[in-house]
């Protein structure tokens, strides 16, 4: 079942398309990683998906509810952790959550039980000081508790690990995996690939307001590798003969070995040619770029 579906989702500011015709789906229990550099359109997209920004064109459905036409119904089944979440600084975590529970028309007894459980879940049950004295990581954990307050089926997280220390990132990953394991659908944005690939079943890479690749991490890597060369190293017992193949881009020979860059994996062809020449292959290895390498080169022009 598709819990999130966008159809031609577009936002135009002063004639410039900040988000350009996004169409994708996210299934139940799926963790979708929405990745791209700052300014790519991630926050604007999420703003439209949670009903805070009106699309210029297209629509977003959350569990078949049109977010723009039925924002209150969509709010009932969604949770949202914005980048730079804000709270009342003079109130405690419990007091802040109790205030927000009013927006969901929760009974006091139900709200108290839910808040107590959530604070324990995010590790803030023993913190009684005002939120204004919280660290960045503590505020993010409280923000997650607020996003889960109404026990939503779909959760939107905008740069949730931004500014967290390594331990905080690990804690967030653990919670996200637990939520997905319990059937929650999670839409998770970040500008750092490593922060989402550990928990996401599907990723979408956005640049200039457009999704340039989408699928599982392996599928995205293969798709983005189509225009990228591979490196093949060949070693033989004696002298390395010259090898010919139209797909070879460069070749470097050094005694009993050679390193080729090629437009695709040609190990089979190289092995067959060496066999025809009566040369035994001692080593034949392929080196492909990692998803991180491709991501950095495509969006940032390299590391």
Predicted ranges, named:
Residues 226-303:
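Short, charged/small-residue-rich alpha-helical element at the C-terminal edge
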Residues 2-6, 11-207, 213:
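ABC transporter nucleotide-binding domains
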Residues 75, 97, 112, 170, ...:
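Generic structural signal for individual residues within well-ordered alpha-helical segments
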Residues 121, 175, 223, 269, ...:
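Solvent-exposed, charged/polar functional surfaces in cytosolic regulatory/catalytic domains
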Residues 173-261:
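ABC transporter nucleotide-binding domain
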Residues 70, 107, 221-224, 266:
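Alpha-helix capping and helix-coil boundary motifs
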Residues 1-4, 301-303:
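Short, Lys/Arg-enriched, disordered terminal segments
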